Amino acid sequence: MQPPTGAVSGSSSSSLECVSSCRTSWRGGGRPYECSVLSCAWNAPRALTGALASTTAQCSSCSHAEAGAGWRRRGQSQRSNNSLLHITWAEGINRGKFGYGSSAHSFPTGNFFKSWSTSVDPTWRVFCYSSSESFNHISPETLWEDLKPAISYLQPEELNFVHDALKLAYEAHNGQKRRSGEPFIIHPVEVARILGEHELDWESIAAGLLHDTVEDTDMVTFERIENEFGVTVRRIVEGETKVSKLGKLQCKNEGNSKQDVKAEDLRQMFLAMTEEVRVIIVKLADRLHNMRTLTHMPQHKQYAIAMETLQVFAPLAKLLGMYRIKSELEYLSFMYMNPGDFAELKKRVEDLYKAHEQELEEANQILGEKIAEDQFLDLVSVETQVRSVCKELYSIYKTALKSKSSINEINQVAQLRIIIKPKSCNGVGPLCTAQQICYHVLGLVHGIWTPIPQAVKDYIATPKPNGYQSLHTTVIPFLNESMFHLEVQIRTEDMDLIAERGIAAHYSGRGVVSGPVRPGISSGRNSNGKVICLNNTGFALRIGWLNAIREWQEEFVGNMSSREFVDTITRDLLGSRVFVFTPKGEIKNLPKGATVVDYAYLIHTEIGNKMVAAKVNGNLVSPIHVLANAEVVEIIIYDKLSAKYAFQRHQQWLQHAKTRSARHKIMKFLREQAALSAAEITADAVNNFVADLEDESDYEQSIPSSENKDYTFNWQKILNSDKLSFGNKKSDCFLPVKNVSVPKVNGKHNKTVKELGIKINGSTFRGDSFTDFIHPGVSSSKEVLPSVDNWKAGKICAWHNTEGSSIQWLCIVCVDRKGMVAEVSSALTACGITICSCVAERDKRRGIGVMLFHFEGAYENVVSACSGVDMILGVLGWSVGCSCNPLGVLEC
């Protein structure tokens, strides 16, 4: 007898042991089938330790029947001497359920379910066989008879197309074997079965059957697929082939490392799915079947494939809302990557479930009775089911890692899921909407049990980006056992369907369209014939992140390697997320730890380039503020700042940008601004680059470090690098600011305009002299606020006859907020500055204000004052200067 699927030679590094035998004998033969009921990887010796050492499943718990040449047909008797069995396995971690009243009851015990009903959800499957000779009987017709029940929801003409695709795939793969020794055709048929379980349209299923034909054979071409099955099937198969074939071609190039080849492989997959979403849906089904049969790969490849699945494909399934596939991918990946923790955690969950089985059943009964007695639910719903669900194993593991808890400290593993099937709303009134029914049930749950504060999550009012909708609450069902917490999820039948299938529901059944559907137009139907409707808004929300991938590719082509591109997607899109709101209530999701800078560039590149400040929940915050869930973020923009100051500000933000896309956009902006300042900057040097004036080297002087070196050195450098220009004098008359002791004006203060002058190192300059050092944020007063030219005459004064007095100007651009003038005034006073006068004006529309101070103070105090002012929250830029002009000194 040949080793079964799930068992290989004992000499292999990934040798397996069969943990059970199916004692069901085939009709016409007396020998039993040897099979592994559990997933193949569980049988590996490295995993058969601890809890898994005794995980021997009884085949009486499995449902298997043969059909055709060794293929299962549910509900039919065995017809011939075939030797391939299909073991149906419903794993308690993911599929446990029980109902109240007429609903099915199932509780997980050990590794599978003890069932109180005859129906067991056949979700995860393991194939086993007794002899390789059995595969000689496989034919297109026997394969079709096995596949057909899974796609029976299709129309007859659609079934014909799928049947033709199966025959073509069989012809193309005839004679090919998988690593396990089974015919290769089994793989595409199983991919098609997975797609059928999600009730995908016939084009997706046909593409699943044909996805390897062009890559692995010479007899099938894209043109043939298009001629026989249409352009949509070709587009999906072409997207699949581009991904797989590219990696194989690049592997032949010795100059490319395996990491580079894999990165380019993933890059092409991401780009292909932006053109056709079903490319990734078929790819997920392909990866899922490969994970189910991963045991035949060498152990080092098992780990690498499981790692890639966990980092890329499981998060992609989550983004698409396909939680059923996402859960199994995470489960299998966790099992291969960390078998020790997997076994320990699985045993802990089983022990907890057994320990609380009685309490869980009692809670279910109490809730079921309360629902049955509710007259409102009886009026507006056809049926309400209550199911017990064990939390996903990998989800529990991540929670334990996040809280830095040990596996033995885990307590919460059970959930109750309430599924409501509403009646038609005709004539009943507005309270019968699906959302209102869910909120009503939430009130019932909180009326029975004590909810845990801040543990209610409303994903109905604010759905997740992948379309997931549900109400979550955590309660304490028994006050005498306060450590036993129970999560309750409330959703309608349609919400549950979308939660399981996600974007696949849009491509369900016959009513699929290639683009976003029109509002109210059916996009498919489920196996019960119920119409599923996804309007434009819902569909756009689910695939909005695909647009981001497309934009990154278009914007950063040539500037980002394949590794960087894939890293951007895996970190920025597929990692942990935080959800925030725009002022209009739109949901935006960013990677966990993202700042306001990331949010601004997510909205639009120009928004990020012009951002000067932000408000979170109505409060002014710094652009480097780290965002938290449910915050409302408003960006304040201002485009009148000088190129140099914009450069400096964005340079500071660069290190606080979480997303790679935001960092790339900032570096691009910095290069543009550096060009405006006649300076060079590269991506490698951006963190160390300091923008200076064009002729800075002619004027810069060394300044002794001050007491507060960290805060004042930059301002000393900026002030020293500024230039003095005097009317028509040549550039050699320019003097550095450092040599200006204190600008002085001859004469005393008068309201009339007089010729003014300043003394610099004992020399007096008169007439058309003009001194300009406006930095770092404002290039001229007109750029600060357009209305500055039109200020009232009473706000403009001329100074003269003030010999012996120092005059300085400080202009501040800031966000318009309460208390800003007081804070700036306090900062100036604290630095020893005497404020002579101040005037302020604001632009209500943009929320920007300008303050112009006339003050007296020594040069050293000005340096400290500039540093202190810049530390004030909401200050966008400042400028200092003194002016002497025949037309007078502008001062407010």
Curated annotation (Swiss-Prot):
GO BP of this protein: guanosine tetraphosphate metabolic process; leaf senescence; photosynthesis; response to wounding
Domain TGS: 574-637
SUPFAM superfamilies, sorted: ACT-like, HD-domain/PDEase-like, Nucleotidyltransferase, TGS-like
The keyword Cell division appears for this protein: no
Transit peptide location: 1-52
GO cellular component, one term: chloroplast
Molecular function, one GO term: GTP diphosphokinase activity
Compartments it resides in: Plastid, Chloroplast
Classification via Gene3D superfamilies: 3.10.20.30, Beta Polymerase, domain 2 (3.30.460.10), Hypothetical protein af1432 (1.10.3210.10)
Annotated catalysed reactions: GTP + ATP = guanosine 3'-diphosphate 5'-triphosphate + AMP
UniProt keyword Protease, yes or no: no
Primary localisation category: plastid
Stated family: Belongs to the RelA/SpoT family.
Protein task: May be involved in a rapid plant ppGpp (guanosine 3'-diphosphate 5'-diphosphate)-mediated response to pathogens and other stresses.
Protein name: Putative GTP diphosphokinase RSH1, chloroplastic
Organism: Oryza sativa subsp. japonica
